[in-house]
Every structure is written in structure tokens, then in C-alpha cells.
Amino acid sequence: MNTTSNETLTTVTQQSFIIHPNKILLMILYRYGLGFVFLIGFSGNFASLVTFMSPILRVMSTGCLFFMLAMADIFYLMISIFEFVEVGIVQEGIFLSVYDSICRFRWFMKGFIRFCSAWILAFIAIDRWLRTRFPYKTNQWCTRRNAFIAVSIAAVFAILLHSHMLSSQLFGGLFPGTPSIACGPIDTRSPYVFFFFVQWQIIQ
């Protein structure tokens, strides 16, 4: 298994350098690309928050779901600021003394938010379908309470699914400052390397 783990890590490292051969181009993409994403993303999502906080929309399940989706997007953008600074501005690993803890927090939160956002979008589609297909059941099924329950269930599953990233024995800094492999398995000889780089990519 150690041989498999080492081969997996070597392959991932080689692929990373193939994907990012030009550091200057990578820096430009992160600095200006993410900067543009932040500008559009923050302004658009804050506008959504203002819209769905209105008295008329916030009493509807659909309005609550869109509000939570905007909040999730804002949190995801905030977490991405670290990569913007590390790769696009400083161009090397930052906060190295606590890098392992930052890795665990960032990767767990990014996975958690992506999972929840995907399910919130699914719940919005289901909510709209129920309102169209069963209009007489709208007041019973499409409520804020049910929306919160559905999102809470998705959040619990997201925590369980991504909890391995919070383990200080398994996850931490790998190659600080290198996109896609800045964080990863701490012990490069453990079976977790194969799980994270191969099996986890399929699971998530």
C-alpha cells in the first residue's frame, strides 16, 4: 500500500506541474481572474441578500432557499481570498506556522459549502416543481420550516462526508503555495493518499 501511495502522490505532483507550467501566467490568472470573480460575486450575492430579505420574499420557502444559497456563495468567496493572496499576490505559502490548521479549515469548509450549495439548488428546483404540480399543497409542503429542515439534513451529511479533512492525523499542508496540491494527506505513505487523490475525487 505504501508503494501505491507513493506512486499516487508522484503522479499527482507531476500532473500539477504539467497543469501549472507557467508561474507568471498562473499568478495573473489568480490575481486578476479571482479579483474579477470577487467583484462580481460579492456584489451579486449581496444584492441577492438584500432582495430576499424583503418582507414578501423571506416568508416564502423559495426566498429562504435563495437567501441561504447567497450566504453560502459569500462564505465560499471569503474562503477563496486565501488562495487569491497566496497564489496571486504573495506567490508562496503564507502563515506556514499554522498552515496545517488553515488547510483543514479551508478544505473542509469549501467541500461543505459546495455540497450544501448543490443541494440547495436541488431543493429550489423541487420547491418550484411542487408549487407548480401541487398548488393546493403549497402552504403545507413549501414552508420555511421544511426548507430549513431540508438544508439542515444536507448540512449534517456534508459534515459527515467531509469530516476526514478535520483530522490532524490525516490532513494538512502538502505543498504550500501550489494550487490544487497545497493541502493534502500529511503522511505520504499512508493509504489515505490513495483515498484522497483517487477515491475521494469520485465520491465528491
Describe the residue ranges of each PLM region.
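Extracellular TM2-ECL1-early TM3 structural module of rhodopsin-like
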Residues: 23-35, 62-123, 131-134, 138-139
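Extracellular N-terminal segment of 7TM GPCRs
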Residues: 1-43
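Fourth transmembrane helix
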Residues: 75-76, 86-89, 113-123, 130, ...
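Transmembrane alpha-helices of multi-pass eukaryotic membrane proteins
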Residues: 30-37, 64, 106, 145-151, ...
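Loop architecture of class A 7-transmembrane GPCRs
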Residues: 9-20, 89-112, 139-140, 160-204
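Lipid-exposed faces of alpha-helical membrane segments in multi-pass integral membrane proteins
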Residues: 33-46, 50, 68-71, 75-78, ...
